[in-house]
Amino acid sequence: MLHYRKGEIKEYVFRDLPKLLPGDALMVYNDTKVVPARLLFQRESGAHIEVFCLEPLSPSDYNISFASRESCSWKCVIGNAKKWKGDVLHLYNPDADENIARMGLEAVLLGRDGQSGEVLFRWKDGSAFSEVLERGGRIPIPPYLNRES
């Protein structure tokens, strides 16, 4: 860790942080997690469609949408969007165990605007949508990192 004071830069380790901060400093702890919101689906033809969940639409509250147990719709970025002709897509996960297959996650395109659209997700096993994403989704990794999640 580098610390700049009065025109001088010094190197420290993290445990030195308390002595470097002013007495009235406010520390904020960030315990957020990245949601595995990248889902890979497959058409009957075999074409793969990637759906990246951006924000919930129905229900529109994140907590309520993540707690949904049968269906919810989200605004999504759709990879390979031109190949999705409006048919029902089924989750594709070559590494899936039978629990992922049993949940029966499907995606229905309700509307599209270029590379994004409204997608209705339906599943059969009664799990919360947050659990569906944890089991079937992937962590979104920026393309410039040149690696998979």
Segments from the language model and where they lie:
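Internal, non-catalytic "lid/hinge" segments that mediate substrate recognition, gating
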Residues: 5-18, 32-35, 39-149
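Terminal targeting/leader modules
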Residues: 1-2
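Loop/turn positions that initiate beta-strands
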Residues: 23-25, 86-87
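Short hydrophobic beta-strand that contains or immediately precedes a catalytic carboxylate
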Residues: 27-29
